């Protein structure tokens, strides 16, 4: 499933509304991008949404660790494993 590995942002479903106000179900997908983070000295490729990527852009390793620890409840299991090393 498409989900940001840091914030947990995933699919959102709702209605698409036409000009005549006819409702059809649709799904909004997160804008996921693959980026490399340095966690505990080792590079890791992660899928993050564009908003998270904007936050991480230009962040030092210390700031990245602070962001990861702030979102510990929504981190993927793979990131949790690297964080606990």
Swiss-Prot record:
InterPro entries: Bacterial_rp_bL28, Ribosomal_bL28, Ribosomal_bL28/bL31-like_sf, Ribosomal_bL28_bact-type, Ribosomal_bL28_sf
Keywords noted in UniProt: Ribonucleoprotein, Ribosomal protein
Protein's name according to its UniProt entry: Large ribosomal subunit protein bL28
Keyword Secreted: no
Lineage of producing organism: Bacteria, Fusobacteriati, Fusobacteriota, Fusobacteriia, Fusobacteriales
Gene: rpmB
UniProt source species: Fusobacterium nucleatum subsp. nucleatum (strain ATCC 25586 / DSM 15643 / BCRC 10681 / CIP 101130 / JCM 8532 / KCTC 2640 / LMG 13131 / VPI 4355)
Single Gene Ontology BP annotation: translation
Family affiliation: Belongs to the bacterial ribosomal protein bL28 family.
GO annotations of cellular component type: ribonucleoprotein complex; ribosome
Superkingdom field: Bacteria
GO molecular function, one term: structural constituent of ribosome
